[in-house]
Amino acid sequence: MNTTVISILTTISISFFALNASGQTYPGKALQLQMQKEETAFLANMKPGLQHTQMLAVRDAMKGDYSALDQIRQSRNQAPVLPETVETKYITPDICLFSPVNATERKRPLLLYLHGGGWCFGSINSCARFCAALAEAGDCCVAALNYRLAPKYTFPMPLNDCIEAFEYLKQHAEEWGCDSSRISIGGDSAGGNLALAASMSLTGVHKVIPIYPVIKLFTEVTSSWKEYAQGYGDDAELLAAFNEAYSSGDSHNPLVSVGLASDETLTELPPVLIISAGHDILFDQTAEFARRLQRLGHPLSYHVFPTATHLFITVPGQPAAFQESVRIVSRFLNE
């Protein structure tokens, strides 16, 4: 029996029908329209030239000048207000545990979460809203990691940090009331890439949850690459700078460009949940990756928000996509 479950908010292209081997679900039109309304407002409020400025900062840092990149990192590292129903605790200097305050006798699932930011910026604070929302909605624990950032720390150093964090969580999960046999890895954008690469490198990962992940760190001019190359949350020139800063000339390594992993490697992954934004430069490469998992008969749940754009996990402004992601991921972690 094919274990692939595809959830698509609307039919975006004929290519997706090939994925629908075991059925589709369609949320109501109201949610689709709400996501579209929020995306329009989000993009209208985006500061003109922001991503070009970020690209220049990354390029300068690659040449040794970190002044502009450090300013961007500081501006994106503001601690958000979190619900009182969730406790936060640093269990190491670089890992913050988000857990529900209410007591429970059951062992909770645990998610290692890896923030986005093109491997060059981002932090625990970037993803804290999402981690706290997951902990509350899913009655689970979420451990967010500050992995080392490019371009100072290139592949494989950030990936090694993620692998070591998982091993640490595995050793200590029971101390926090978590189930050491149900530790999953997730992340958004660059963090989704790291989640997949770490899951390919480890044994014992329960599930893997990449959200609008970077699948290939080299340019392939697809329809989404052309249509959403500018003005949609992750411009092509910025993505190219991110890719070069992290890969450091090793972009075709399958632990860097996870879409190049062998069939054997992919079939050894744990069950996969992918969430994609339809208006995203990364959309086509993620869809191709999902189709490949489907052809291999791999356990896959693939959700597309066709009227959302990149960044809805870490940057406020697309609450419907954010909340729907919380609902989907929470359910997946507890299945």
Tell where the protein language model's regions lie, with residue ranges:
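Alpha/beta-hydrolase superfamily serine-hydrolase fold, recognizing
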Residues: Y26-Y66, Q71-Q74, Q78-E335
